[in-house]
UniProtKB/Swiss-Prot annotation:
Subunit structure: Component of the outer dynein arm-docking complex along with ODAD1, ODAD2, ODAD4 and CLXN. Interacts with ODAD1. Interacts with PIERCE1 and PIERCE2; the interactions link the outer dynein arms docking complex (ODA-DC) to the internal microtubule inner proteins (MIP) in cilium axoneme.
Record protein name field: Outer dynein arm-docking complex subunit 3
GO biological process: brain development; cell morphogenesis; cerebrospinal fluid circulation; cilium movement; determination of heart left/right asymmetry; determination of left/right symmetry; epithelial cilium movement involved in determination of left/right asymmetry; flagellated sperm motility
Disease as annotated in the protein's UniProt record: Ciliary dyskinesia, primary, 30: A disorder characterized by abnormalities of motile cilia. Respiratory infections leading to chronic inflammation and bronchiectasis are recurrent, due to defects in the respiratory cilia. Patients may exhibit randomization of left-right body asymmetry and situs inversus, due to dysfunction of monocilia at the embryonic node. Primary ciliary dyskinesia associated with situs inversus is referred to as Kartagener syndrome.
Location (main, coarse): cytoplasm
Free-text function comment from the UniProt entry: Component of the outer dynein arm-docking complex (ODA-DC) that mediates outer dynein arms (ODA) binding onto the doublet microtubule. Involved in mediating assembly of both ODAs and their axonemal docking complex onto ciliary microtubules.
S-S pairs: none
Membrane spanning stretches: none
Keyword terms, alphabetized: Cell projection, Ciliopathy, Cilium biogenesis/degradation, Coiled coil, Cytoplasm, Cytoskeleton, Kartagener syndrome, Primary ciliary dyskinesia
Coiled coil stretches, renumbered: 94-327, 385-473
Length: 595
């Protein structure tokens, strides 16, 4: 959409014949020429004078009644625009007058504050007397302390100046906002007047603006809702932060205890892993040793067998040789006797060889080389066999007894089957009653458990509250109380009653101390101190206080010749710079607190 200034320039740039042929363009040009004059405010002139446009229109439109009607409409529009301009001029004059009144009032306040500062700087005694009159309860404390009284008063003065500057800044911002809203209102009125005669682009623009306004309102409502939710969350978190320290302490203690347990378990695990590795190495070494010894025994047995066979063959050859040699010399009787003796000797040797082979197999099977250990194993096997026989007999007796019990139970089952349905029904009723009683007991147990949990939660909340209250009253000491000089054990069973008694004694003592004082006056004093402390806490770290000298001359702080120059109002640029610095200091302070 083109601006009204562009349309006015294009309308003024047309030749005379084009202006006569397009009266609507001249109407738009005149409307546009009135709009920027309204926006520029006072002291601005219209694009052309009404007399010139009137004469020109009569000269060009002679004999055309439509031109007269257009001229009349243009006169009406010009009158409306002139009325809008006058209204805007009057509102601007009223704003200027109001601002001048505000400036004069602020000048008066500044002069009064300067006079007050001059009175305060006249002497130490006067300042001390003023401070003592203002704070009667601090009279013994500030009687002979002029420096501290001046510092305190200077601090109060600086705080008041800060509050005044903040209020001035808010007033300036609201005035600027009011001017912007008035300007927007005038623009909306002009656009509405123009939209009544034009139903094309301006109407579309109005609808778009209305849609945007509705969207902005919806977003604003949503933002307000989100803000309320965040405020509720903040309040909830503030309530939770009261008990957060105790919970954090308990959780930290639990974490430390768990870390110690984890370290101990790591040590035990490492020892177990080392023992496992050692056992594996020993087992592997024993297996390798066993395999080597077994192979060694097998080689030794095979060598012994070979030597025995060789000796046997040599003996047989020697026997055959001796038999052939003595065969001719001996008789048949002697030959038979020698044969019988040799046969007996061979049988004995063969039996000895068989016994050695069997004994070697037994050694291979048992893995022992000594005869005594082999005998002990066979004796142990005999004892084991006897124990197994005993267990076998006992198991047979148990089996017989169980068979008898089974037969007896089967007979009882048959008796129960044919004993009738009355017993079964009664047993079912008893079972149903027992189940109902069980359900009641379970419900009662669940209710008791819930009550116990609620009581435990209430006890925990009370304990946390009492601990918080005790931490607030830690500076109060009760010398003649029950708990004087005693330290309460949090792990003891009577910790909560003892803590309640201690808090009660401290509160009673505090109440007794407050009986002779004015409560309202003390509350006001505490509120002022908390406000000042909060302001001091919000200052950044690099902000330092410079103490003013006590003995100063009048010309050093108050110059009557430059009084007129000091009455000048702070400019908008300097006010913007100061407000920007103040906002940046607050942001830095918040970041430092978060970090």
């Amino acid at each position: 959409m083109t601006s009204p200034l562009c349309r006015a320039a294009s309308a003024n740039a047309l030749p005379p014949q084009d202006q006569a042929s397009t009266p609507s363009s001249r109407v738009k040009g005149r409307e546009a020429s009135g709009k920027p004059s309204h926006l520029r405010g006072k002291g601005t002139a219209q694009a052309w004078t009404p007399g010139r446009s009137k004469g020109g229109s009569f000269h060009r439109g002679a004999g055309k009644p439509s031109v007269h009607s257009q001229v009349a409409e243009l006169h009406k529009k010009i009158q409306l625009l002139e009325g809008d301009r006058k209204a805007f001029f009057e509102s601007s004059q009223w704003n200027i007058k109001k601002n001048q009144e505000t400036i004069s009032q602020l000048r008066k306040e500044t002069k009064a504050l300067e006079l007050k500062l001059l009175d305060l700087l006249k002497g130490d005694e006067k300042v001390v007397q003023a401070v003592i009159r203002e704070w009667k309860w601090e009279k013994p404390y500030l009687k002979n302390r002029t420096g501290q009284a001046l510092e305190h008063l200077d601090h109060r003065l600086r705080e008041k100046v800060k509050q005044q500057n903040a209020l001035r800044h808010q007033v300036v911002l609201r005035q600027r906002r009011l001017e912007e809203l008035q300007l927007q209102h005038s623009l909306r009125l002009l656009e509405m007047a123009e939209a009544q005669n034009r139903h094309t682009e301006v109407a579309k623009t109005m609808r778009n603006l209305e849609n945007r306004l509705e969207k902005a309102q919806m977003k604003a409502q949503e933002a307000e809702h989100i803000t309320s939710v965040y405020l509720q969350l903040k309040a909830y978190l503030m309530d939770e932060s009261l008990n957060l320290e105790n919970r954090l302490d308990s959780m930290e203690a639990e974490v430390v205890r768990t870390k110690h347990e984890l370290e101990a378990l790591h040590v035990v695990n490492q020892e177990a892993l080392n023992a496992r590795d050692i056992a594996k190495n020993q087992l592997q070494y024993l297996e390798e040793t066993l395999v080597r010894e077994r192979k060694k025994r097998e080689r030794y047995i095979s060598e012994c067998k070979k030597r025995a066979e060789e000796k046997k063959l040599e003996n047989e050859r020697m026997e055959r040789k001796t038999h052939r040699e003595h065969l001719l010399l001996q008789s048949d009787d002697t030959i038979q006797d020698s044969l019988h003796a040799k046969e007996e000797e061979l049988r004995q040797r063969w039996s000895m060889y068989q016994m050695e082979v069997i004994f070697g197999k037994v050694k291979d099977a048992t893995g022992t080389d000594e005869t005594h250990s082999l005998v002990r194993r066979f004796l142990a096997q005999g004892d084991t066999f006897a124990q197994l026989e005993t267990l076998k007999s006992e198991n047979e007796q148990t089996l017989v007894r169980l068979k008898q019990e089974k037969q007896q139970l089967q007979r009882e089952l048959e008796d129960l089957k044919y004993s009738g349905e009355a017993t079964l029904v009664s047993q079912q009723k008893l079972q149903a009653e027992a189940q109902e009683r069980l359900k009641k007991e379970e419900r009662r147990h669940a209710e008791a458990k819930d009550q116990l949990e609620r009581a435990l939660r209430a006890m925990q909340v009370a304990k946390d509250s009492l601990e918080h209250l005790a931490s607030k009253l830690i500076h109060i000491t009760v010398e003649d109380g029950r708990f004087a000089g005693k330290e309460l054990d949090p792990q003891a069973d009577n910790y909560v009653p003892n803590l309640l008694g201690l808090v009660e004694e401290k509160l009673l003592k505090l109440q007794a101390q407050l009986q002779g004082h004015d409560v309202q006056e003390m509350l006001c004093h505490i509120a002022n101190r908390e406000f000042l402390a909060s302001l001091e806490g919000r200052l950044p770290e690099y902000n330092t206080r410079i103490a003013l000298p006590l003995a100063t001359s009048k010309d050093k702080f108050f110059d009557e010749e430059s009084e007129e120059e000091d009455n000048e109002v702070v400019t908008r640029a300097s006010l913007k710079i100061r407000s920007q610095k103040l906002i940046e200091s607050h942001k830095k302070h918040r970041r430092s607190r978060r970090s």
